[in-house]
Design a protein with these regions (language model features):
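Active-site acidic/histidine clusters and adjacent loop/turn architecture
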Residues: 14-67
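Structured soluble/peripheral alpha/beta segments that form catalytic or ligand/cofactor-binding pockets
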Residues: 100
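Long, solvent-exposed, polar/charged low-complexity segments
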Residues: 1-15, 44, 131, 136, ...
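Short histidine-centered catalytic/ligand-binding loop motif
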Residues: 29-36, 116, 126-131, 190-194
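Compact, glycine/acidic-enriched structural inserts
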Residues: 105-164
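Hydrophobic/aromatic-rich structural module bridging two neighboring secondary-structure elements via a short loop
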Residues: 52-96
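Short, flexible loop/turn elements at secondary-structure junctions
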Residues: 69-71, 90-92, 107, 116, ...
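A short, structural micro-pattern
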Residues: 80-82, 97, 106-110, 171-173
Length: 223
């Protein structure tokens, strides 16, 4: 049962960020297992199980990331990830763009929300076309989001793609899109309450997740 993370988890993540090499990791591998990996998997499984009960028609998969980076994509970085996460998303092809619900733990923050790792140009073009054709559903969601603790994010175009109005321009003129809540690694992070907070957040975000997920079924607009 998930009991919260601990300061030991944060200490490990700071340690691996400052000593990202095999010798240090092997000397602290048990710390990683006990304080980071096991609690992350417990949190992911319990959140996933609760959501599966709430939304039985959704076909989801839980993925808990490994700490090892892909050796083919180090790009000068160390062999270990310095922040860890789990995602809940529908099954998809390897390079298919799908949104996910996520929880992430880093040495200096924790975060949870929904969105794309990389939405891709085609997905964002579909979003703009949907806004052009029927803005009202997203207007309702945008107003609701603006009253919440969650924040819209994602790289913006230097030259706007168009003018969808003050409310929807932040959605319209992005290269990627996510909705998240960040907090300092303290307080509730170290308690079982974190699971309930993440669950409540995911339930709040479900209309946004579903809105984004259905973009895959839209026709790609003519360029």
């Amino acid at each position: 049962m998930f009991q919260g993370f601990s300061q030991n988890a944060i200490d490990f993540l700071w340690g691996i960020s400052l000593n990202n090499e095999r010798g240090w990791f092997m000397a602290h591998k048990q710390d990683f297992t006990d304080y980071v990996d096991v609690p992350m998997r417990e949190l992911g499984k319990e959140v996933f199980s609760a959501l599966a009960e709430d939304y039985p028609k959704q076909d989801w998969r839980l993925h808990v990331c490994r700490i090892y980076r892909d050796a083919r994509r180090l790009h000068g970085r160390g062999p270990y990830k310095e922040h860890l996460w789990f995602t809940i998303e529908r099954p998809h092809e390897r390079f298919e763009s799908v949104p996910a619900l996520y929880f992430e733990l880093a040495p200096n923050y924790y975060s949870y929300g929904c969105g794309y790792w990389d939405a891709g140009a085609a997905t964002m073009a579909k979003l703009r076309a949907r806004i052009d054709n029927d803005p009202k559903p997203l207007e309702r969601l945008a107003r609701r989001l603006n009253k919440s603790k969650f924040v819209l994010s994602g790289e913006e175009f230097k030259r706007p793609k168009g003018d969808a109005g003050k409310l929807l321009n932040p959605w319209y003129n992005r290269k990627n899109i996510a909705i998240g809540y960040d907090d300092n690694p303290e307080g509730v992070l170290f308690t079982p309450q974190l699971k309930d907070d993440v669950l409540d957040g995911f339930r709040f975000l479900m209309p946004y997740y579903q809105y984004l997920d259905t973009l895959a079924g839209d026709m790609e607009p003519n360029r």
